[in-house]
From Swiss-Prot:
Name of the protein described by the UniProt record: ATP-dependent Clp protease proteolytic subunit
Gene that produces this protein: clpP
Keywords, sorted A to Z: Cytoplasm, Hydrolase, Protease, Serine protease
GO cellular component: cytoplasm; endopeptidase Clp complex
Function per UniProt: Cleaves peptides in various proteins in a process that requires ATP hydrolysis. Has a chymotrypsin-like activity. Plays a major role in the degradation of misfolded proteins.
Sample GO molecular function, one term: serine-type endopeptidase activity
Source species: Sphingopyxis alaskensis (strain DSM 13593 / LMG 18877 / RB2256)
GO aspect biological process, one term: protein quality control for misfolded or incompletely synthesized proteins
Transmembrane helix listed as a keyword: no
C-alpha cells in the first residue's frame, strides 16, 4: 500500500561535482547521523530504525548518532529491538524528545547516552507499566499474565539503571500513567537537559538548560 503522505515529504537538491543529487529530507538528515522515531513503535518501523543505526555504525563507528523521538509508544518487543541495537552499536546514541515520548517512547528516550538525553521545552513524557490482552483458556491467560509481569520487572530494572531512581520510586510511577513535563522528566532522570534552543557552537555563548531557571 502506498503511503499518501509520502508525496508530501520535501526533497533536498544538492549540487555536486557530478551534477545535482536529490534526497528526501529524512535521507538527507540521515547523512548527518540523525534518526527519527516517530509514530507508533511497531515491527516494521523498528526494523527501519535498526537498519539505520547499523548503517551509521558501519559508516563511522566513532561518531555520535542523534535520535529524535516523537512517539506515543507501541509494541514492547519492537521497542526492545531498537533499545538493544542502541546499546549494541559502538557510536553513542543521544536522544531528543520533540512533542511526546510516551510508554515505549519514554523508555527509548531514557536509554540514550548519559549526558546526551534532551527534551525540548514543551515536550511531554509519559511512563507506565506494559499492558496486554489475554484470551483463550485459563492456562493460556495465566502464561500470558506471567510474561507481562516478567517484562514489567525487566523494564523497571532498566528504568532504575537509566534514571538513578530507586526501584520503589519506579514501581510507583509505572503503576499508572504518569505524565511529566520536560523539567519533571529531567528531575525524574529520564533526560539530562531541557533546551529551548540548540546548544551553542564553539565561540558562541554557552548553552543554557532552561530547566535550571532564568539566568541573572
Amino acid at each position: 500500500m502506498i503511503d499518501p503522505l509520502a508525496a508530501l515529504v520535501p526533497v533536498v537538491v544538492e549540487q555536486t561535482s557530478r551534477g545535482e543529487r536529490s534526497f528526501d529530507i529524512f535521507s538527507r538528515l540521515l547523512r548527518e547521523r540523525i534518526v527519527f522515531v516517530t509514530g507508533e513503535v511497531e515491527d516494521n518501523m523498528a526494523s527501519l530504525i535498526v537498519a539505520q543505526l547499523l548503517f551509521l555504525e558501519s559508516e563511522n563507528p566513532k561518531k555520535d548518532i542523534y535520535m529524535y523521538i516523537n512517539s506515543p509508544g507501541g509494541v514492547v518487543t519492537a521497542g526492545m529491538a531498537i533499545h538493544d541495537t542502541m546499546q549494541y552499536i559502538r557510536p553513542r546514541v543521544g536522544t531528543v524528545c520533540i512533542g511526546q515520548a510516551a510508554s515505549m517512547g519514554s523508555f527509548l528516550l531514557a536509554a540514550g547516552e548519559p549526558g546526551m538525553r534532551v527534551a525540548l521545552t514543551n515536550a511531554r513524557v509519559m511512563v507506565h507499566q506494559p499492558s496486554g490482552g489475554a484470551r483463550g483458556m485459563a492456562s493460556d491467560i495465566e502464561i500470558q499474565a506471567k510474561e507481562i509481569l516478567r517484562i514489567r520487572k525487566r523494564m523497571n530494572d532498566l528504568y532504575v539503571k537509566y534514571t538513578g531512581k530507586s526501584l520503589k520510586d519506579i514501581e510507583k510511577a509505572m503503576d499508572r500513567d504518569t505524565f511529566l513535563e520536560a523539567d519533571e522528566a529531567k528531575e525524574f532522570g529520564i533526560v539530562d537537559h531541557v533546551y529551548d534552543r540548540r546548544p551553542a557552537l564553539p565561540g558562541d555563548d554557552a548553552p543554557r538548560d532552561v530547566s535550571e531557571g532564568p539566568t541573572p
